[in-house]
Amino acid sequence: MLQRLVVALCLLGFAALTAAAAHQRPNFVVIFTDDQDGIQNSTHPRYQPKLHEHIRYPGIELKNYFVTTPVCCPSRTNLWRGQFSHNTNFTDVLGPHGGYAKWKSLGIDKSYLPVWLQNLGYNTYYVGKFLVDYSVSNYQNVPAGWTDIDALVTPYTFDYNNPGFSRNGATPNIYPGFYSTDVIADKAVAQIKTAVAAGKPFYAQISPIAPHTSTQIYFDPVANATKTFFYPPIPAPRHWELFSDATLPEGTSHKNLYEADVSDKPAWIRALPLAQQNNRTYLEEVYRLRLRSLASVDELIDRVVATLQEAGVLDNTYLIYSADNGYHVGTHRFGAGKVTAYDEDLRVPFLIRGPGIRASHSDKPANSKVGLHVDFAPTILTLAGAGDQVGDKALDGTPLGLYANDDGNLLADYPRPANHRNQFQGEFWGGWSDEVLHHIPRYTNNSWKAVRVYDEDNQQAWKLIVSCTNERELYDLKTDPGELCNIYNKTRAAVRTRLEALLAVLVVCKGESCTNPWKILHPEGSVNSWNQSLDRKYDKYYANVAPFQYRTCLPYQDHNNEVSAFRSTVAAAAAAAAAAAAQQPGRRRMYTWTSAGRQLSATASAIATSPQPRSEPFVAEVERHSVPVPAEVLQSDVAKWFDNPLALA
């Protein structure tokens, strides 16, 4: 009798644990690199085999995923806040129009993804690069929203072999002779173990610096000056001889290396010299160094997946891989860098695996839905079971098109729009400088806007770029993916006028108008897509829409300088939408997964916490080798270090 009772109790206990696990919300692990392109083959399985083994093959790649402000700090803010830079007004790497002080003064960390997730019962973790000028001078002013944040601090952020971190605002430590990505991997594994032991769902973001350029900053007592030096990325010692036969991919469909004829480009690009053979040889080595620096990131992926697997949480975890912005090497007339409106700088990798996502099992099938960094936060919230809250946060993004790869177990209320976004805008304020060919002078007037239209069936793909000088470029991306032939004055008026109208709306969009600009252009509802807009009966209307114009070139956002006929219309629509949302009854249900995964039940019950919470965090082995940052560095004037902010981005 006693034996039967014990068996019965065991079965009941197992059933309870199974039910609790079935209702536990998913975890998220995001591996977020720095300056990794989505075009020049940096994620090829030859160079990142573990990325494919652990994320691409068990998941999917979004092949049309873009950033909209191609420089690190504004782009990271787009990711966490779900808003375009013209709505965050965080537009630069450093102050006064960017930088950590402005980021805090804008209150961005009062309402962004980690805070929202904590409000849902998640623990949140961060390790690696946060923002460029999070430094030895301001580390105590910790960004809100993180259960545990172990962030790189300047001047050690881009020092591959001497990284420095501050954990939760503590005095920074450095790790002399230890490779930055390896230190981040050790710390990330410890954070994940801590997160699992806490027994709550978690979001962990891991942000290595590769393949960003290396930066050395030090004070020269003889010259009584701070000196900053920029170099190509530095691989881990064990990876220096990898990929010695790799070359810049001239065989891609873009074919825009060392563009000879730039007569149709803006004046500042026409003034750039064509790279000579010695420069090209150097750029080839820069390309190889970027690939080699990513080899340690690939090893990091392997360690993270092994940790999740050993902890038994891999199957309930979304594992995501992406980057803060794209990067070009040798394209057009450029050496190496970012911040242009061309696709090399805008397109980034985005790979994801997790509950409900059908495995691709190869590199060939891919998701063709357009995705942007502003879509990231609403996607995470929706997958976390809080899709009903997305509309409350004034976001410009919408959940990614993961429904196209539903294996039958994706959330039942995951949005499945009839018309997924097929147009978006890009924007940048500031200058341009070449990050490796330092003999090329810096150009200060590189502010620009762009609009890109993409037909999922690949029948049409267009891009319009407007420089702050009001010079215009238009490319047919279906026939010219390398953006070599500017056809602004050659294409038919119907295409040109529709693109101009879309740009005029999207550069000032807020909320719904960012995903559906047609509602602003055609409030009566007669047009809901690019193809519908091309009907000849609308030719006269579009011919009379005033194109977007700059009054002058400025390195920052000024609404009076950026002239759009739709600014007041968009603002009124956004205000009306906010007022309507405020009148809606509050929906604050906490959604949980059922064992089938397809259905959701509304409940206020606590998150399953099968393991007993662990009070002390796991400590990474590498911590034994850390030493305090020298006192003279802690007392130095950080502002003097930033003499080339674009190279630091």
Curated annotation (Swiss-Prot):
**From which residue to which does the signal peptide run?**
1-22
In its UniProt entry, the species of origin is given as Volvox carteri (Green alga)
**Regarding temperature, what does the record state about activity?**
Optimum temperature is 60 degrees Celsius. Thermostable.
* Induction statement: By sulfur deprivation.
Q: What Enzyme Commission number(s) appear in the record? A: 3.1.6.1
Name under which the protein is recorded: Arylsulfatase
Q: Binding residues for Ca(2+), per the UniProt record?
A: D34, D35, C72, D324, N325
Annotated catalytic residues: C72 (nucleophile)
Superkingdom of this protein's organism:
Eukaryota
Inhibition and activation profile: Inhibited by Na(3)BO(3) and KCN. No inhibition by sodium dodecyl sulfate, even at high concentration.
Activity profile over pH: Optimum pH is 8.0.
